[in-house]
Amino acid sequence: MMRLAYLSLKWQAMGWLVLGRHAQALAAFDKLLQRWPDDAYGLSSRAHLHAQGGRFEQALADNERWVQVAADNAHAWFNRGYLLESLERYEEALASFVRATELAPKLDRAWYGQGLVLIRLKRYDEAVAALKRNTELQPMSPYGWYQLARVHVDRHNPEEAVKIIRHLRGFEPKVAAQLERETGLLIGTSTR
């Protein structure tokens, strides 16, 4: 009977989400978490809804509980890092992203998050290492490459930024052009 009640609330919430009715979905997750306060799915889902609504403190409260009940879940730590970064609590965010990569070394988003937070903390050498790992894991995603090029410019290492711009031209020419405009590094039309 308990399992049926749980599934009923979970499916209610999911149904409301499919219909785009976030307030009703949130109410269903509230009911679910009243009965099962340590439910990882309910905590993570409600945290996500709060974050979507810009309620980062509430999202963080749910995520903190999620981390407590699922301490070995890399995604819980990644989400915690994201929320802390959104709240400009960069040192705490960094610790969460690091924990996420310890638990799941191939979690590219956590490496990217680390890179962004390290940039905010002006720890550029460490940011380079994190962003390089992100680009190794996601070589065709322009986001890590873009940030890596920006860090190289900030570190007064334009030669490395130029290499990245050339690399990006091969699969993301618009991002390469944006970097050229933003950095003032005009590469020309050569792809070498």
Question: What are the residue ranges of the model-derived segments?
Answer:
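TPR/TPR-like alpha-solenoid helical repeat scaffolds
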Residues: 146-156, 175-192
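Canonical tetratricopeptide repeat
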Residues: 11, 45, 79, 113, ...
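Structural signature of tandem alpha-helical TPR/SEL1-like repeats
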Residues: 19-31, 53-65, 86-99, 121-133, ...
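Helix-start (N-cap) detector for alpha-helical repeat units in TPR-like alpha-solenoids
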Residues: 5-6, 40-41, 74-75, 108-109, ...
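Alpha-helical segment of the N-proximal tetratricopeptide repeat
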Residues: 4-41, 45-54
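Structural marker of alpha-solenoid helical repeat scaffolds
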Residues: 35, 69, 103, 137, ...
